[in-house]
Amino acid sequence: DEAYAIYATIIDYKDVDNILTNNKNLAEVAAAVALDEKFAVGNYVTLGRYPQMQSGEDLTSIEWLVLARDKNKALLISQYGLDAQPYNESETNVTWEKCSLRAWLNDVFFSRAFDTSEQQAIILTTVANDKSQGYSEWNITGGSTTKDKVFLLSYAEAKMYFGLNENSNTKSCIQPTAYAIAQGVFVDGASASWWWLRSPGHEQYDAARVGADGSLYYHDVRDSSGAVRPAIWVDLDSPFFQ
């Protein structure tokens, strides 16, 4: 395992098995170091399973990008667009708090993608939706603060982590899975797709999105051709990771 590998690379430690077997505290420290390194910002990790083949008959491990760390908590966002969903099922003035996509993420997606032990490792996160999270020139309210296990990035968060603005930006471009394309995700050219943010768009019946070229834009909340790129905070101290 990873703890073993750490000690195996240290020249002075020849009897790695004996060291880790007879010193529980040392083994625990080594395991903690390995976990910390695994979840370093910029790394990719796997957690949960979701259909990714065109047929939808598979359950493939979900790959996540580590966006941020807060001590033993890690913010993850899916590497790929995993599904196609509208921001809201009806065309109406709506915020993240009331949209159908939030409900879908925290019910259907959450229960389908994660087993019980994984669900317990995912933190119920306080999600800010005030105007500071949105694009200032649009000046549209994002609604009330919510508590979510699964959420989407806001415009402010996408700007912080990916440098999102109105210009093309390869850092914020993504590919959808074959399953997501089969569900209706729009693909621009070879593979790029646009993906939803939780912030409002130019009007209250729009939602912000990241274009296929990685730029900021907005779309009608009913549009079902956008990719869903979930985000979660996980507790690295939870039993699942021990």
What annotation goes with each model-predicted range?
Residues 7-23:
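Short solvent-exposed coil/turn linkers within tandem alpha-helical repeat scaffolds
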Residues 28-242:
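Collagenous Gly-X-Y triple-helix signature in extracellular proteins
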